[in-house]
Amino acid sequence: MIIGVLVDEEYHVQDTIISNKMTECIKHIHGSINLIKTKYPDVVIDGSILILRPCAQNGKGIKNYIRLDYVDEKGKNRVRMWNLRQC
């Protein structure tokens, strides 16, 4: 089951994320992601869009986190990060 698309900082597709644990992580994310859906219509997962990309925890060092940028139901930009070891 493909549950995400991993892209680099410039949104070039690097890999697909296939992980049941990642699915469990993403189940905690609620809200509208219409802004991302409009900008990146090719990345669609279960009717929702997930832009997943590698990053470091504070912008420096090894990119051992997955970052998800999304828009919540109030239209606010949100970021969720997971350590790759967790997923």
Task: Name each model-derived stretch.
Residues G4, I18-N20, T38, R53:
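Serine/threonine-rich, low-complexity intrinsically disordered segments
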Residues E10-I26, R80:
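A short, exposed loop/beta-hairpin motif centered on an aromatic-Gly-Thr core
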Residues M1-V13:
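Short aromatic-glycine-(Arg/Gly/Cys) micro-motifs in beta-strand/loop hairpins
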Residues N34-C87:
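Short, mixed-charge low-complexity intrinsically disordered segments
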Residues M22-I26, H30-I33, K37:
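Residue-level detector of alpha-helical secondary structure
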